[in-house]
Amino acid sequence: PRVYQIIEEINRRFIIEVQNKYPGNYEKIKKMAIIYDGQVKMAHLAIVAGFSVNGVARLHTEILKNQELKDFYEMMPEKFNNKTNGITQRRFLLHGNQNLAAWITDHIGPDWITDLSQISKLKVYVDDEKALQEFMNIKFQNKQRLAKYILEHNGVEVDPHSIFDVQVKRLHEYKRQLLNILHVIYLYNQIKLHPEMEFYPRTFIFGAKASAAYERAKKIIKLINCVADVVNNDPSIGGKIKVVFIENYRVSNAEMIFAAADVSEQISTASKEASGTGNMKFMLNGAPTLGTMDGANVEIVEEVGQENAFIFGMSADQIINYENHGGYDPDFIYNTDAEIRQVLMQLINGTFSSDTELFRDCLLYTSPSPRDGLLS
């Protein structure tokens, strides 16, 4: 086809450029070629033919420049730049959380609607008890609205006074919904073991869709629902934990979820999330971030201050070092931590499903494998 002939010509001219810049470096030519071994590398074509190449968060851009696209960045650094993803406050605050939007306008005027930097004017109310109580009343109203939706759609009664701990996003292993639900199981075990311990009630809310052919992602959704069935129907824990999986997660119910969240779970394996925008939507609606220094979380934490976020886990550099040099040993963790071992064994001992093989593949993470780069 004519289009392929054009790609061949672009490739021919580009290889000449690479040869001129790196004479005799055939390994470099092989790595950077647009067409190699019968395949057209579309990313290479886009970089060569395009005017500008950008990552979608500062960390993501640096990883592209220093790792994934290092050869191209070294040859044509002027093409590379960062454009951190963004959201519009008009959709996810003005439209999605109308009571909070009205409260903000009452306190600082309407300029924030077209210039979000104006929101910083709210800082003067940080110690104003009346303003803070009004803010929390709005949050509680939003939580009541979501609790009503959950009762109607899931048949689960949740306490709007509990902490709404929320993770809603595409289901993927690197986003670590599995880590989240394993933590829920751990807390469930602790409450069962120590019923007298102080524990403020928490409602764990998940929402996600999995790609059609992504079997493991679908298995994780199944696990979340199985855990929910057990936890929500165990009278011995006194309703201290509830688990909800919101079906058909989409923008219309997302707006309600963002407005009601107390905690925003942004726990991807550092270096794997390009940017994320849910992290922005939650923070815009007054839910602090619990997460890793990944994607746009890095810039959010810089903006709001480390003291206003709950950050854990390894850095992107540490994760990449594990990938390059090894050293992550889940077997050691499994063999030396009885509480983690109990959680993992509950996946296959009938606690959450009579089919003891159903979640066995989730245990593959306890054996060293290439997938361990996700550190789930």
What residues fall within each predicted segment?
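Extended, charge-enriched "interface" segments that sit outside catalytic cores
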Residues: 96-157
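Gly/Pro-rich turn-and-neighbor structural signature
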Residues: 1-51, 56, 161-190, 199-203, ...
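Segments forming glycine/polar-rich beta-alpha architectures that bind adenosine-containing cofactors
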Residues: 54-107, 175-196
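Catalytic cores of eukaryotic secretory-pathway lumenal/extracellular enzymes that build
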Residues: 244-251
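Short acidic alpha-helix that forms the nucleotide-activated donor recognition element
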Residues: 252-260
